[in-house]
Regions:
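C-terminal non-catalytic interaction/assembly regions of soluble proteins
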Residues: 252-445
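Accessory alpha-helical/coil subdomains and C-terminal extensions
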Residues: 37, 94, 102-107, 113-117, ...
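N-terminal phosphate-binding or glycine-rich loops at protein starts, especially the Walker A/P-loop
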Residues: 2-51
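Short, ordered loop/turn segments at secondary-structure junctions
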Residues: 12-14, 35, 40-45, 78-79, ...
C-alpha cells in the first residue's frame, strides 16, 4: 500500500443539499497540494466493522461538477461508532490500515460527537475536522450562521407550502404541514415565516418542561376560529416534528391511533403528528359546530437531496476548502465554520454540553426580534384579542360561545405570549421584543394586529 499521505472524507447522518460541494472543494484543494483523497462510502458503516474495501479514490476529474447535485457522491449512513468501544476501535484501526492520517467528517450533531470521540481515540495518529451539516439548522453555531443545506431545504419547502396555500384557498381547507426538525424548530419557522403561513408551531414556544397536547390543539383551533371569523375557511399551519418529543408520553399513550412496541409503549419515532392533530382538532371543533376539511402533510425527505441553491453551493465550497486547508496545515480537532466571510475554527471541546456530554443543540431564540416578527404575522389568538371586546365577540360568535365561555376555553393560550414589538430610539431605532412602555411609539395597543381580515394567508 502506498505510504503517500491520505485524506479521507465521509458523510454521516441524513442527507442535506451541499454535501457534494464540500466533497468536491476539499478534494480539489488536497489533490492540488499533492495529497491523495479517498471517499469512504456509507459513513462509519463499514469502518466500524473493520472493513476497508468500501473506499474510492477521489480525483478532480471525478468530482469537478458534483457540486450542482444533491445527495452524496460517497453515500451516507447513520451508523454510530461510539455506541460500542469495539466499533470505535475498529474505526480507528480501519483508517490506519487505509493510511488515512487526516479525516473530514460531514454531518450533524451525532456525527460531530463521533468525530470528537474518534479524534480522541486516535490520540494524534489521525487528525480530524468536522463540517456541520443539517437541514435542521440546530448545530451550536453563532445565531447568524446557518448550517449548510438549511437554506436550500427552506427554499424548496417554501415552494411546496406556497402551492399548498393556493390549494387550501381554492378548496376551502386547512393543511397541517409537519416539517423536519426533531430537536429544534428552525426549519419549520424558516419555511412558515418566509411563505407567510397562517401560523407556525415550534417546540421552543411551549416553555413548560412538557408540552400539553391540549395546548397545541387549542392553538390550532383558535387559529381556525379566528380565521373563520374573518370570512376565511382556509389556512395552513407549519408544525415542527419535534413537538412530539416534548409532549407528555402519557398523553400520547391515551391515543388510539399510535404505533406501539411489544411492551405496549408508544413508538415516538413512528408517531404521525399531523394525523393525530388533524383528528384531535376536528374533534375539538365539533362542540362549536365547526366543520372543516384538514389535510395532514409531511415534508422533509423531499428536501434533503434537492440540488443546492447557489448560496449553499458557494457556502459549502468555502467550508470544503477550509476543512482541507486546515488539515493540510497541521490543524486538528475543530468544527469548520464561516462567520462574517471569514474562516473560524471552533475547537471540539467548545461543542460539548457539560450536562449531556453531547454536542450542544441550537434552539430557536423565542426572545429574538426575528421570532417576534414571525409571531406578529401569524393568525392565532393573542393577548390583544382578549383585550378587544369587539374582536373577541366575533370569535365567540363564530364558536357559538358567550364571551365568558370563550375566555374560559382559550385565554390560557396567551400566558406565555412573547411581548409585543417596540422601537427603542435609545438604541438607534433597533426593534426589540419587550413590553410596551409609556411614551414608546409602538405599544401593545398600537402594535401590528396581523394581516387584515381578508388578507393573504
Amino acid at each position: 500500500m502506498s505510504q503517500q499521505k491520505r485524506l479521507g472524507i465521509l458523510v454521516g447522518g441524513g442527507p442535506a443539499p451541499g454535501i457534494n460541494s464540500v466533497i468536491g472543494a476539499a478534494t480539489i484543494r488536497a489533490v492540488l497540494e499533492g495529497v491523495e483523497v479517498v471517499g469512504i462510502r456509507d459513513g462509519f458503516e463499514w469502518l466500524s466493522q473493520g472493513h476497508i474495501d468500501y473506499v474510492e479514490t477521489l480525483t478532480i476529474d471525478k468530482i469537478s461538477r458534483i457540486h450542482f447535485r444533491g445527495g452524496s457522491f460517497i453515500g451516507i449512513s447513520r451508523n454510530n461508532p461510539t455506541e460500542h468501544p469495539a466499533h470505535l476501535e475498529n474505526t480507528v484501526i480501519s483508517l490506519l490500515r487505509l493510511n488515512v492520517s487526516m479525516l473530514i467528517t460531514i454531518g450533524g450533531d451525532d456525527t460531530a460527537f463521533s468525530a470528537m470521540k474518534l479524534e480522541e481515540k486516535a490520540a494524534g495518529r489521525i487528525r480530524v475536522v468536522h463540517v456541520p451539516k443539517t437541514i435542521d439548522n440546530d448545530l451550536d453555531l453563532p445565531s447568524h450562521v446557518d448550517t449548510f443545506g438549511f437554506q436550500t431545504a427552506r427554499h424548496n419547502g417554501v415552494d411546496i407550502v406556497k402551492n399548498l396555500m393556493v390549494d387550501a384557498k381554492t378548496t376551502s381547507r386547512w393543511y397541517f404541514v409537519v416539517a423536519m426538525g426533531r430537536k429544534a424548530g428552525h426549519l419549520a419557522l424558516g419555511i412558515g415565516k418566509a411563505a407567510g403561513a397562517t401560523l407556525t408551531l415550534i417546540p421552543e414556544e411551549f416553555q413548560a418542561q412538557r408540552i400539553r397536547l391540549r395546548e397545541v390543539v387549542d392553538t390550532l383551533v383558535g387559529a381556525i376560529v379566528k380565521r373563520l371569523s374573518y370570512g376565511r375557511r382556509d389556512g395552513l399551519a407549519v408544525i415542527a416534528e419535534g413537538l412530539v418529543l416534548g409532549i407528555d408520553p402519557s398523553e400520547l399513550a391515551a391515543l388510539d391511533n399510535v404505533e406501539r412496541d411489544a411492551h405496549g409503549h408508544v413508538r415516538i419515532a413512528e408517531v404521525n403528528l399531523g394525523e393525530i392533530l388533524k383528528a384531535l382538532v376536528a374533534k375539538r371543533l365539533e362542540p362549536f359546530g365547526i366543520k372543516t376539511t384538514i389535510v395532514a402533510k409531511n415534508i422533509g425527505y423531499e428536501l434533503r437531496c434537492a440540488d443546492p441553491i447557489p448560496v449553499d453551493m458557494e457556502y459549502t465550497r468555502d467550508l470544503g476548502y477550509c476543512a482541507a486547508k486546515y488539515l493540510l496545515s497541521g490543524g486538528n480537532a475543530v468544527m469548520i465554520s464561516m462567520q462574517g466571510g471569514h474562516f473560524v475554527p471552533i475547537p471540539f471541546r467548545e461543542l460539548l454540553d457539560p450536562q449531556t456530554g453531547r454536542a450542544r443543540i441550537r434552539l430557536v431564540d423565542i426572545h429574538s426580534t426575528r421570532y417576534a416578527i414571525a409571531r406578529r404575522y401569524m393568525i392565532r389568538l393573542r393577548r390583544d384579542d382578549f383585550e378587544d371586546p369587539h374582536e373577541l365577540a366575533k370569535f365567540a360568535a363564530t364558536a357559538g360561545l358567550s364571551l365568558d365561555q370563550f375566555r374560559r376555553e382559550f385565554d390560557y393560550l396567551i400566558e406565555n405570549e412573547p411581548p409585543p414589538l417596540v422601537i427603542d430610539f435609545e438604541k438607534n431605532g433597533l426593534v426589540e421584543a419587550r413590553p410596551g412602555r409609556e411614551g414608546s411609539p409602538f405599544s401593545e395597543e398600537t402594535a401590528d394586529a396581523g394581516p387584515p381580515p381578508k388578507g393573504p394567508g
